[in-house]
Amino acid sequence: MAFTTTAVVAPRGAKITGQSSTCAIQNGKTVAVGTSKQVGSFKPVFAAAKPAKETTFSVSCSAASDDVPDMGKRKLMNLLLLGAIAGPVAGAGGPFVSFLVPPKAGGGAGAGQAAKDALGNDVKVSSWLETHKPGDRSLAQGLKGDATYLIVKEDGTLENYGLNAVCTHLGCVVPWNASENKFMCPCHGSQYDRTGKVVRGPAPLSLALAHVSVLEDGVVAFEPWTETDFRTNTAPWWK
């Protein structure tokens, strides 16, 4: 939960109050206030002064419920996860933003949308496989700009499908946990197996699939997956 306040300095013993959308502190004790979905708390900073009977101070607060991650949260998670896999880069703030904007055209001849790396460049299959070991699942920018996992098979070649990293519960980006051999959402605990099939809720559906191919110039490309989901033998819910 995000929770911010305006700093308040009050005499010792003061009573600081507010409405349901603000923070309340009584007698120096932390008091959680707000609606059932927007609750937060913080401790006041008191000045060394004589106790006051009662003094009211205005406290500016804002709370964002974790029940529904907004677009800002989703973009931030994309930024952090994609930045982490790319490693330190000078002026990193700019390059990583390329994952948060619509993809650019390009990537050679043939059908499909070119996968983009953390710098916004087309992903070349040769260089990708040089830096990603068998079993690796790392993010690239996929269809509609969504973070999408490219999978390296045990034989060192690229899997012919990619996994949309957006959790089907409330839209958080789901990281791959290699030690657990599954995708584990940090927001509400949903889990998916190595193929992206949901194995634990609250997520109701498996991660969306995308076709992965290599164009004539060696650029990796994504294409929409419209046929049966091989993991569930059902029509794709994302169609």
From Swiss-Prot:
Cofactor: [2Fe-2S] cluster
Domain of life per record: Eukaryota
Gene Ontology CC annotations of this record: cyanelle thylakoid membrane
Residues that, per the record, bind [2Fe-2S] cluster: C167, H169, C185, H188
Keywords: 2Fe-2S, Cyanelle, Disulfide bond, Electron transport, Iron, Iron-sulfur, Membrane, Metal-binding, Plastid, Thylakoid, Transit peptide, Translocase, Transmembrane, Transmembrane helix, Transport
SUPFAM superfamilies reported in the protein's UniProt record: ISP domain
Transmembrane segments: 81-101
Domain Rieske stretches: 125-221
Chief location category: plastid
Transit peptide: 1-60
Assigned EC number: 7.1.1.6
CDD domains per record: Rieske_cytochrome_b6f
One Pfam family it belongs to: TM_PetC
Quaternary context: The 4 large subunits of the cytochrome b6-f complex are cytochrome b6, subunit IV (17 kDa polypeptide, petD), cytochrome f and the Rieske protein, while the 4 small subunits are petG, petL, petM and petN. The complex functions as a dimer.
Name the UniProt record assigns to this protein: Cytochrome b6-f complex iron-sulfur subunit 1, cyanelle
Organism, as annotated: Cyanophora paradoxa
